[in-house]
């Protein structure tokens, strides 16, 4: 839209936010995925809440956000019937987590994170593929994810496993 209407932003007295995100989608084709003996992808329960909060706090917390905010977010995700909070266990320890929102007409994937020392080893792909395969068996929805454009690694991961760009979201703010 903004490419076709280059004067829109200035005519309305707006400025583009530096942060943009891309929405990607994927069909329902399952992945061929071999089981890895020391890895398990499970729906989380409250017994994993502290490990999940710690991982999400390290990966996603803004400077102004407290651990308590992350704890509340994880607790709500565990209770919400429209939400699935998955964990990736390696030798029984949580090394990854991802949430799926089921409240719309797609399986909306967000918050995928792998612990810092385990990144770059294919665990993010394994977690995403595994939870997608599980959801294909449970419902008839396609998949969607939004990725901050600055998060090049995550964007590359999703494109590598078959997600395709649907649109880019540009946030507009009033000029100060």
PLM segments and residue spans:
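A conserved beta-strand-loop-helix scaffold within acyl/acetyltransferase catalytic domains
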Residues: 66-113
């Amino acid at each position: 839209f903004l490419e076709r209407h280059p004067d829109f932003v200035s005519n309305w007295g707006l400025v583009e936010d530096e942060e943009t995100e891309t929405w990607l989608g994927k069909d329902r084709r399952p992945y061929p995925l071999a089981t890895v003996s020391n890895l398990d992808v499970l729906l989380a329960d409250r017994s994993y809440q502290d490990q999940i909060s710690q991982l999400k706090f390290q990966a996603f917390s803004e400077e102004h956000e407290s651990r308590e905010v992350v704890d509340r977010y994880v607790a709500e995700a565990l209770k919400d019937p429209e939400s699935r909070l998955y964990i990736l266990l390696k030798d029984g320890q949580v090394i990854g987590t991802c949430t799926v929102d089921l409240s719309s007409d797609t399986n909306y994937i967000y918050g995928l994170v792998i612990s810092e020392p385990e990144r770059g080893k294919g665990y993010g792909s394994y977690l995403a593929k595994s939870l997608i395969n599980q959801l294909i068996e449970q419902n008839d929805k396609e998949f969607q994810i939004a990725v901050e454009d600055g998060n090049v690694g995550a964007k590359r991961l999703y494109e590598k496993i078959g997600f395709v760009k649907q649109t880019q979201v540009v946030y507009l703010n009033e000029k100060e």
